[in-house]
């Protein structure tokens, strides 16, 4: 039977079954058919889903979309058929079947308004169809680039982001992360990447058009902004459009350059009456006005950039500094020469080097003008008149017979000077004042025949006067006021709130808004206005140009409304818009302001008042971006977030935790579930903050690697109002309105097994210690195995048995002898994570000596070495091969003679060694090849080598004597290094380093820290006594002048070297005030007799705690109490810190917050363990003062036998913060 017939037969059977069920609802066979059809339909739903999901998951590729459609259509048909069959069959299970079908259908196939995880196949089809449409756009854009079609490229450049922004949410609805990621990476990411690669190209093209349009519209600021972006981006365009865009940009830049180059638009001239005259008829005392196309920078307008030359001979005309000035708006240059021009002469004014406010230079240009032969007024003077011109008149009464003198630049014809041509008129009434006018040479004298009225305005007019040569004298008018005053300021500008500005200082905190309001501090300010009163009434028409509000930095005049109250002589200034916040402004009252009598304020009375507006705008968070995205962040990598604010901040620090104490900053990284109103120390993730150089208000928030956890959500919180330390602006006046929260998630659960990455020799993770070749070892040798990730340390994951030893035989690698054993211990890295294991060769079987061995990490499916997620190491990793046996130096001693007899204890030792002794070196290997002088190197403290010979003892093959060529120095520490010795089979003897000290000369007293006869000595000051060499038991006494002994102190032997001693007063104990004391030190240091070395001193009133805690002694600790060592020695014989913890006793209570202890194996010249501050414990002191530091009561540290270790303790301090000296001692 073929497949089609089978399908038809199955369909017919199903229909028949449906009919039978309808007639026989209780028939078991019918029920079985319904269940089968329902089950088959559900299977088809899942098959349609698996068609895309399994293909993507297993192959990493998309299935043929036609296959997905086919299975999708089958699923829809199966659903319809199954629903019809269930409805026809009816029965008790009808509703359950229908509900089950609907649920499965809507989950896997289709639903009208699906939620996340529903309608999986339909959603995939929609997403795939959209993605292919997006890919078609990408291909069109790619083709445009290949064809170098810039117009088409720009078209699709804009289309693609619109699609991505408005429709790629379809991709996010697809069920299955693998499928979503493949859709994004294949279609969305590729389209975005291609589009983004053209960002500079399209921006240059758009900005070039913007320049052209802005230039045409006269918006040069907009054109300049676009030009700046073209210059920034043009070097970054792709090769595809570089040629075309370079040409496009050039055209735009040329258009901008032509429009932006400022220039002198026109030149005009006026006479002394402020009337315009032709440039061909300029009077000798005329004034030039140069009108500019743009506001000039005042600093560039001067007599060097505006110059005047005689045209004939190009001879410069001398101008004084004050002759050239610039208007307030910066657009008019006035040239008013102090020296008159020559009559009937042609001049030119040359402009060169002037710049606008943006630094752009004006076009160089020249303009000619010509002087006429008419006579002009050069001076007007008298003792009784004040006026508004540059002529020389003074204030005072003006009586009958007083005179006014007018001087011209040429001789005048006397017959033309009379009371008809020279008049004085009352401005108010028009009445002529009787005068007598006479002339002498070029001067007209006007004699009053009637007194002028104080405060009244008069007009002097001269008309129809001629020169002796027949030329006209200029028509001249002068309005003046008899005995008038300049309009000086009576009350400086004052705000509505009552703040009065002043000259010479900046007034801050001025409310800058037109409407009244309250700042963040809660202070109310009325609206913005300034009132100023004057000593006289004003000419209101002169206010606009001479009473101005200016933004200081830009020089821009602020549009303002001026109101004048003549009765109150008050000017009110109100800006037409709110002022900029946090900005300096100036109110300028300029010389051109006139009184109602026409009297000018004058330069001497000009005023400038400066004020700064309040900052009222709270900062906002513009954006938070993550360097690695906001989802799936890797916990083993450092993460970086960029936070950008709307303005600069006062401060921006990370929140930190010390123990359970939280120190709040302005930002914190916390766990997703943290309650921001009640954060705990465990909620906060360590983070750091750094400002981004060159970017205002921008900061980097950094989280180090391994601080975050897998499969977790987190918040980056920028704190606002209500927080302990909210974000504030740079003025510290305004606060971020509310908390800003940025969320992100980390990568999912770890399913990757750990692997071995490196092996290091010793307890080390330094690259210098990495094992790359065969290496000699012996029992006690350590290796550090580094793994690819953090390891589990519980349930025996890192214990013995996890690493075994094998040796190489003729039959290959076999288990090492039973006596060869290893131990395994966890090791933390710099981030406090266990990412390594320290393997110690705890035993070495005799049969394995001189064999080649290897370490093997054994796999185990259930309890092998595993990461923190429980993934067990999969491979049986061979780590390293090495020779097992390493011979060592047994000891180095001082020998009395060359036969090695009467030797001292083994070095190192503080016992004084005679300077004539030889050194006896003993090896534990009897079959040595040779020991040469270069194998035994002895050096003094300065590093100078000691010459000597090496000989073997008679009958001995492992004992050698080093005999110095000269006697050693007294009281000197010598180091001994034995290296390079080999046995006869080629094994290298382990390098060995030790030291000894020679006997010292008789010691002397070097110094006492308090001078003899000192006064005002600090009553708590530590007293230091120093000897030239070791003095084990000096006798030191302290007593008052009356003989009363003072013993409430501890005599501290600094560093236990018997050379420096300190008298440290007991806690809370001080010397008496203003009292004389005597400090005595015995001359015979061993017997304590004959006390005659002493100082006397007198105390003051001061007693400060500047005393560092001092080491009192080194001893042992039994868990509850401290026992001082009997001998003052730095050499202790200790097997391990667990059985025999070492205790250090200090002179006072100590604080170990920053204390550190390092342990160095000086035999092998390496640091073998660093004990953190948690491993030193002051709480074990039996008393409450905590004076004892106990080493290794928390972290066990077993030491190697026969090795010498150096212990260094640093960072111990007392309650006052005084840090103790670093302490060094040795154990073996």
Curated annotation (Swiss-Prot):
UniProt xrefs under InterPro entries: Cu-Rt/internalin_Ig-like (IPR014755), S-layer_SbsC_C (IPR041378), SbsA_Ig (IPR032812), SbsA_spectrin-like (IPR054605)
Origin species: Geobacillus stearothermophilus
Main location: secreted
Name by which UniProt lists this protein: S-layer protein
GO cellular component: extracellular region; S-layer
Source organism superkingdom: Bacteria
Statement: the UniProt record of this protein carries the keyword Secreted: yes
Role: The S-layer is a paracrystalline mono-layered assembly of proteins which coat the surface of bacteria.
Localisation: Secreted, Cell wall, S-layer
Signal peptide: 1-30
Keywords, sorted A to Z: Cell wall, S-layer, Secreted, Signal
Pfam family name, one: SbsC_C
């Amino acid at each position: 039977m073929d497949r089609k017939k089978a399908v038809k037969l199955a369909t017919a059977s199903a229909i028949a079954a449906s009919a039978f069920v309808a007639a026989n609802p209780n028939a078991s066979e019918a029920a079985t058919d319904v269940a089968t059809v329902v089950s088959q339909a559900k299977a088809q739903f899942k098959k349609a889903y698996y068609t895309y999901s399994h293909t993507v998951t297993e192959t990493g590729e998309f299935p043929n979309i036609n296959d997905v459609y086919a299975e999708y259509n089958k699923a829809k048909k199966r659903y319809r058929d199954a629903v019809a069959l269930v409805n026809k069959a009816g029965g008790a299970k009808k509703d359950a079947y229908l509900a089950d079908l609907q649920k499965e259908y809507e989950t896997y196939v289709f639903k009208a308004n699906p939620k996340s995880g529903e309608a999986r196949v339909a959603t995939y089809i929609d997403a795939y169809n959209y993605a292919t449409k997006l890919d078609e756009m990408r291909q069109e854009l790619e083709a445009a680039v290949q064809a170098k079609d810039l117009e088409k490229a720009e078209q699709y450049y804009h289309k693609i982001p619109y699609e991505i922004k408005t429709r790629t949410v379809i991709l996010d609805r697809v069920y299955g992360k693998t499928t979503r990621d493949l859709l994004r990476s294949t279609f969305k990411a590729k389209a975005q990447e291609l589009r983004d690669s053209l960002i500079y190209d399209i921006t240059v093209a758009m900005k070039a058009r913007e320049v052209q349009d802005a230039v045409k519209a006269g918006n040069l600021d907009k054109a300049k902004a676009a030009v700046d972006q073209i210059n920034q981006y043009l070097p970054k365009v792709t090769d595809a459009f570089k040629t075309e865009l370079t040409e496009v940009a050039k055209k735009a830049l040329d258009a901008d350059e032509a429009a932006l180059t400022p220039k002198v638009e026109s030149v005009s001239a006026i006479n002394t009456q402020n009337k315009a005259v032709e440039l061909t008829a300029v009077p000798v005392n005329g004034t030039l006005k140069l009108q500019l196309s743009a506001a000039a920078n005042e600093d560039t307008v001067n007599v060097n950039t505006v110059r005047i030359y005689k045209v004939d001979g190009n001879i410069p005309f001398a101008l004084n500094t004050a002759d050239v000035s610039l208007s307030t708006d910066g657009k008019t240059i006035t040239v008013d020469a102090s020296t008159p021009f020559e009559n009937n002469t042609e001049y030119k004014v040359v402009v060169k080097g002037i710049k606008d406010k943006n630094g752009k230079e004006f076009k160089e240009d020249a303009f000619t003008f010509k002087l006429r032969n008419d006579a002009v007024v050069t001076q007007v003077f008298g003792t009784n008149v004040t006026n508004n011109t540059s002529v020389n008149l003074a204030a005072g009464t003006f009586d009958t017979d007083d005179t006014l003198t007018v001087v011209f630049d040429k001789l005048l014809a006397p017959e033309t000077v009379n009371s008809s041509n020279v008049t004085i008129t009352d401005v108010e009434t028009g009445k002529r004042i009787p005068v007598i006018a006479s002339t002498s040479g070029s001067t007209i004298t006007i004699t009053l025949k009637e007194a002028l009225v104080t405060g009244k305005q008069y007009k002097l007019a001269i008309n129809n006067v001629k020169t002796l040569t027949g030329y006209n004298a200029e028509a001249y008018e002068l309005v003046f006021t008899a005995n008038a005053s300049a309009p000086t300021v009576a009350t400086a500008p004052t705000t509505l709130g009552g703040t009065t500005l002043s000259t010479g200082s900046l007034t801050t905190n001025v409310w800058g808004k037109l409407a009244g309001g309250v700042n963040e501090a809660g202070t109310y300010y009325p609206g913005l206005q300034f009132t100023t009163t004057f000593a006289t009434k004003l000419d209101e028409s002169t206010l606009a140009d001479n009473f101005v509000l200016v933004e200081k930095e830009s020089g821009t005049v602020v549009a303002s409304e001026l109101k004048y109250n003549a009765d109150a002589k008050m000017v009110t200034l109100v800006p037409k818009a709110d002022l900029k916040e946090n900005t300096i402004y100036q109110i300028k009252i300029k010389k051109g302001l006139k009184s109602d009598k026409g009297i000018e304020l004058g330069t001497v009375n000009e005023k400038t008042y400066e004020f700064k507006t309040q900052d009222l705008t709270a900062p906002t968070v513009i954006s938070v971006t993550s360097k690695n995205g906001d989802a799936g962040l890797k916990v083993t990598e450092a993460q970086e977030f960029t936070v950008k604010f709307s303005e600069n901040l006062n401060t921006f620090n990370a929140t930190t935790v010390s123990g359970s104490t939280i120190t709040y900053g302005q930002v914190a990284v916390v766990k997703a579930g943290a309650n921001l109103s009640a954060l705990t120390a465990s909620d906060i993730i360590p983070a750091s903050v750094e400002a981004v150089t060159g970017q205002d208000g921008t900061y980097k928030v950094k989280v180090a690697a391994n601080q975050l956890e897998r499969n977790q959500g987190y918040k980056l919180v920028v704190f606002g109002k209500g927080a302990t330390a909210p974000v504030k602006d740079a003025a510290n006046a305004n606060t971020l309105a509310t908390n800003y929260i940025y969320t992100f998630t980390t990568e999912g659960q770890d399913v990757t097994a750990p692997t071995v990455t490196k092996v290091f020799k010793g307890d080390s993770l330094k690259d210098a210690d990495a094992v790359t070749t065969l290496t000699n070892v012996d029992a006690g040798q350590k290796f550090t195995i580094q793994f690819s990730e953090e390891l589990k340390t519980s349930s025996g994951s890192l214990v013995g048995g996890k690493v075994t030893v094998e040796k190489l035989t003729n039959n290959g690698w076999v288990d090492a002898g039973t006596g060869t054993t290893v131990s395994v211990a966890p090791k933390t890295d710099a981030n406090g994570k266990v990412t390594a294991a320290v393997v110690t060769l705890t035993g070495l079987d005799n049969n394995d000596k001189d064999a080649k061995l290897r370490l093997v990490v054994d796999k185990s499916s259930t309890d092998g070495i595993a990461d923190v997620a429980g993934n067990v190491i999969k491979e049986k990793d061979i780590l390293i091969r090495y020779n097992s046996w390493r011979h060592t130096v047994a000891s180095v001693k001082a020998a009395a003679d060359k036969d090695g007899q009467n030797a001292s204890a083994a070095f190192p030792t503080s016992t004084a060694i005679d300077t004539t002794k030889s050194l006896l070196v003993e090896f534990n290997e009897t079959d040595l090849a040779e020991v040469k002088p270069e194998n035994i190197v002895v050096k003094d403290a300065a590093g100078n080598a000691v010459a000597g010979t090496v000989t073997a003892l008679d009958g001995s093959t492992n004992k050698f004597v080093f005999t110095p060529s000269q006697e050693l120095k007294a009281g000197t520490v010598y180091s001994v290094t034995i290296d390079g010795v080999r046995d006869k089979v080629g094994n290298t003897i382990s390098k060995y380093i030790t030291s000894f000290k020679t006997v010292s000369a008789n010691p002397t007293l070097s110094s006492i820290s308090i001078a003899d006869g000192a006064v005002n000595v600090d009553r708590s000051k530590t007293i230091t006594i120093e000897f030239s060499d070791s003095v084990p038991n000096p006798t030191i006494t302290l007593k008052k002048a009356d003989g009363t002994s003072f013993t409430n102190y501890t005599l501290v032997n600094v560093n236990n070297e018997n050379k420096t001693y300190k008298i440290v007063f007991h806690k809370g104990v001080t010397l008496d005030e203003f009292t004389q004391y005597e400090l005595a030190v015995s001359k015979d240091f061993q017997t304590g007799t004959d006390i005659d070395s002493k100082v006397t001193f007198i105390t003051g009133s001061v007693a400060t705690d500047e005393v560092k805690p001092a080491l009192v002694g080194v001893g042992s600790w039994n868990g509850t109490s401290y026992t001082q060592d009997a001998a003052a020695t730095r050499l202790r014989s200790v097997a391990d810190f667990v059985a025999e913890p070492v205790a250090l006793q200090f002179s006072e209570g100590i604080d170990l917050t920053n204390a550190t202890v390092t342990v160095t194996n000086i035999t092998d010249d390496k640091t073998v363990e660093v004990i953190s501050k948690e491993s030193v414990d002051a709480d074990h002191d039996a008393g409450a003062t905590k004076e004892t530091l106990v080493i290794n009561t928390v972290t066990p540290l077993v030491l190697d036998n026969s090795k010498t270790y150096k212990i260094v303790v640093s960072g111990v301090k007392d309650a006052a913060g005084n840090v103790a000296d670093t302490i060094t001692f040795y154990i073996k």
